[in-house]
């Protein structure tokens, strides 16, 4: 990976691989166990907020974890985890004597796309902010090496396109199995890959030497389960792995001092990564717009891909 990264020590990559598998393992624990999810995404954050993070992630700390973005990203990811658990498990008995579930309420189904869009928007703002720093020759910001350039604006546009192409949230349902996963069948592989490319470009642009973890590791940890463990539950996988890593990084910022994998600091690499992300999201936006127009759909109400084989496979597996 000499084009993007310059680390050659096998031990560093072994640590990186361990992080990937640890994220997938804890995600699976939080997914398949209700109490595991409560412990990881409700109890642990409260404990960390009171006793740990005020010391390890204080503003201006030497590891760069005390900036506004890390705090906001951590709590927005946790909000997603808790909200998705509510959709999966909250139920009550109504005046009609019947059992009702939160996910049956259409207003509740607006939460997943909303928190996702907010999460992407946070990163878009950070990319624009990085461009505004004017670090054309590169410099250290929040104790991490950064460089400003047109790639920040390119990737910000890709992020906006990624938000625009979020679709089909009224088709979200809860799986029939014991884990009761939040299934979003209209969120197919095209959007997921476009998101992954955009998000990796964002981490490469704005977290540079930390991007093998905040970008590659996190994206692999949520994308692999989506395709091979529990299809249709990408957003649930993404929120949980992101929250897990964010909590870990806030609690143990020293991790980067011995396991950091620096980028090549090559402007061409930054430009290329963001160009790929912009192209992928541009193609997705055009393709999706054509489908919407051809089928006469309302993207705010209708599912875009419910006539595809992949959509039907996800529904059949989980409903």
Label each PLM-derived region with a short phrase:
Residues 1, 59-68, 136-152, 261-273:
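Membrane-interface segments at the starts/ends of alpha-helical transmembrane spans
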Residues 2-97:
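An N-terminal, globular interaction/scaffold subdomain
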Residues 13-22, 73-91, 155-170, 218-223, ...:
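Hydrophobic cores of alpha-helical transmembrane segments in multi-pass inner/ER membrane proteins
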Residues 17-24, 214-318:
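C-terminal transmembrane-bundle signature of multipass membrane proteins
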Residues 20-32, 82-100, 167-178, 224-232, ...:
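C-terminal ends of transmembrane helices
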Residues 37-44, 111-115, 191, 238-250:
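Central hydrophobic cores of alpha-helical transmembrane segments
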Residues 53-59, 121-139, 254-262:
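Membrane-helix interface motif
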Residues 99-232:
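Generic multipass alpha-helical transmembrane bundles of integral membrane proteins
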């Amino acid at each position: 990976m000499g084009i993007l990264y310059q680390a050659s020590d096998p031990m560093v990559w072994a640590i990186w691989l361990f992080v990937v598998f640890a994220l997938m393992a804890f995600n699976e624990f939080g997914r398949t166990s209700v109490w595991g999810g409560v412990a990881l995404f409700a109890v642990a954050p409260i404990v960390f907020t009171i006793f740990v993070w005020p010391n390890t992630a204080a503003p201006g700390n030497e590891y760069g974890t005390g900036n506004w973005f890390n705090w906001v990203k951590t709590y927005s990811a946790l909000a997603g985890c808790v909200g998705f658990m509510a959709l999966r498990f909250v139920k009550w008995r109504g005046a009609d004597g019947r059992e009702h579930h939160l996910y049956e309420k259409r207003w509740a189904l607006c939460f997943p796309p909303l928190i996702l869009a907010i999460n992407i928007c946070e990163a878009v703002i950070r990319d624009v902010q990085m461009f505004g720093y004017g670090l054309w020759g590169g410099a250290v910001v929040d104790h991490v090496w950064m460089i400003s350039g047109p790639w920040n604006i390119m990737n910000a546009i890709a992020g906006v396109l990624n938000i625009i192409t979020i679709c089909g949230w009224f088709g979200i349902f809860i799986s029939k199995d014991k884990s009761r996963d939040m299934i979003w069948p209209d969120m197919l592989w095209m959007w997921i890959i476009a998101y992954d490319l955009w998000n990796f470009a964002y981490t490469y642009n704005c977290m540079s030497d930390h991007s093998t973890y905040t970008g590659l590791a996190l994206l692999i940890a949520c994308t692999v389960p989506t395709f091979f463990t529990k299809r249709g539950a990408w957003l649930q996988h993404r929120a949980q792995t992101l929250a897990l890593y964010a909590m870990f990084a806030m609690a143990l910022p020293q991790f980067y001092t011995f396991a950091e994998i620096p980028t090549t600091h090559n402007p061409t690499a930054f430009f290329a990564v963001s160009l790929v992300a912009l192209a992928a999201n541009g193609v997705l936006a055009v393709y999706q717009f054509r489908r919407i127009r051809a089928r006469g759909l309302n993207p705010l109400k209708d599912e875009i891909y419910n006539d595809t084989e992949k959509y039907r496979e996800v529904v059949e597996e989980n409903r």
